[in-house]
């Protein structure tokens, strides 16, 4: 960034020199709010002032005129700026921080100013601006199209951790937006960089703040050079990135933008990871939402009942962030999960969780502190926290060594080796940083005593002032005879001798009046003035020396960035594994078995979140294999169908995350994606009805699922007419059985679908059981073989508090509908191979019995008169004869 020196630009002669300087700076940041430092405030002018006033609720004022127009102005105090920056960033704004770098005492004209950093949603590193338990990545996006094939390159960087990743994929240009949206939802960037000539593929995405930069920033040759320089390499072959042209172009734009916002290089970005299409278990946005991994279906995340909040027993913010990442990025490679299973088992076996947890609780966010050290923006308490964290490493290593004494957990061995104490780094912060340093270097008291002789001497001069003032006060009282004479100090007037008005006649001739008060006079003497000059000079020099020393310490700490990053990653892994082990111990979770055969075999499985919120949870089995690929699930509303399906998906996902699972045993085969079609909601903003949302999600499943996918389909077809919905549900289920051959849990209220297993041997019926007693229903929540007999919709409505007159009317109408449905009317047979018409006579018998049962259930004998009872008996007779 260029320093803006006062000079009159062409066309700005009518502005004051200060406003000329401001306008030059603002011209370089036209779409960014410029916080312009003036003394103890950051000021905003013109349109920036109006916008900040509206967003922050601060006062909009005017400051004179410039070029004949009033200057609108708003400002915030510099010492409280973080709270205002945090609010603006959450609103998606970017802010350029323009500081005074010149000396007001020596400047002729406006003080020299410079933009030292630009704060944007994707480039945050300050702890006050970042959420503790989640990342805020910056992502750059670039694509090329040839012969209807789009090649899309992604590069993203977590500025707070220094993790840089690339990904590139080719897809049909017409469907590129679907694949791109899936990846963006997975990465969840806080800010997206786009080429200035943004195309339709990118323009529709509003998942984050979109920032456009010039097209030439995405030049592939520039991107290659930028990566070489950043990673200090001569080839990208070792990273597997040499042929990812689009991703390299995106990386070049990303690094240029990130460096420009920080005003310096990115020392903490030292390596590169290339992600591939088949690396993780695929989870689209609907699945993440329906399984409530890190936020509920209603969009709640903080303290909500999610899988993340359930498992997050992490003692460090690093561990919480890694746990969140694992939940969204379960690897298909079974060896990764199995290594975590072995580590968790070792931690549980050694009974070391409580000791490790209590030690980890005193470890700070080493990952983000390391980043701030690399950017030379770490504050004194960051370094004090780093010192405390490094001091815990020997204890943590001892615990890990004890847990892995059988050497059967290679991951713990890797963590143990990475937690070796960096003695040079620890020695430096132990010697240099005070035990309880001030929050800011400008406040002093940051560098420890004994670290620097010159600083100690200057501090001695300043600190001895107290004794000098006591001695001077004693001597002056004796010399003047004024017993209530006081020698004091304040920041405005410096040192002074205070004498009450009644004693001023005793003041010696060498006293010079400094200030007059209502009841006293304040004086200075040549001796006190000389001491003041010496003491205040020593204090200023001590602060300057301390600032210099602190900067030197930071520079020396940057030599240990790579080591500190490795330690941070090991600490995060250990913290996450301990949290998962703790939860498994408390809730009797088991180690899942990952196998190569196609199967999902779960015994006594439970929903991990639901079981934690109710007193007694009914465990259920699930058996899916090459012989049984689809379970048709029927049963009453509120019977637990959705909970059962979700628990199977969550147990499967947890097994691949590397966690133990809520079951007595679980054997899981290869899984590539998990799909869910659960619940119903309009997409009003997108102009889509409930049924359109349902069909869109169903289409994504049918087009994307494979034989290694797990598919959850709940109540497909209910958003349209009965026969349309039934036909679609049947066709979708049949396609999943015949073509996709995915592991499928298919819940439905269309009892006609329960005939599918008679035609397809790889399908089976199960139902959630319930017991009806009079007009009420008891849900047993147990999964049993075979189809359900009825849906118990009226009983559920009654439980929900629907008025009795409505329930009675519904029962009468239901009886009428069922009576009519028993008449032999031609209907197309969904399950017939041809198109010949057939009747529903075979299906009428159970419906007839159901109609009689419902009519009997609707009768309240205690409320009937003899005549009404006789009429009811005739109605039952009539129903039984139909």
From Swiss-Prot:
Record-linked SMART domains: MUTSac, MUTSd
Superkingdom, taxonomy of origin: Bacteria
SUPFAM superfamilies given in the database record: DNA repair protein MutS, domain I, DNA repair protein MutS, domain II, DNA repair protein MutS, domain III, P-loop containing nucleoside triphosphate hydrolases
UniProt entry keywords in alphabetical sequence: ATP-binding, DNA damage, DNA repair, DNA-binding, Nucleotide-binding
Pfam family, one: MutS_V
Annotated Gene Ontology cellular component terms: cytosol
Binding site for ATP: 635-642
A GO BP annotation: mismatch repair
GO MF annotation terms: ATP binding; ATP-dependent DNA damage sensor activity; damaged DNA binding; mismatched DNA binding
Gene3D superfamilies tied to this protein: 1.10.1420.10, 6.10.140.430, DNA repair protein MutS, domain I, MutS, connector domain, P-loop containing nucleotide triphosphate hydrolases
NCBIfam families from the UniProt entry: mutS1, PRK05399.1
Function: This protein is involved in the repair of mismatches in DNA. It is possible that it carries out the mismatch recognition step. This protein has a weak ATPase activity.
Matching HAMAP family: MutS
Family: Belongs to the DNA mismatch repair MutS family.
Name of the protein in its database record: DNA mismatch repair protein MutS
Organism listed in the record: Janthinobacterium sp. (strain Marseille) (Minibacterium massiliensis)
Gene designation per UniProt: mutS
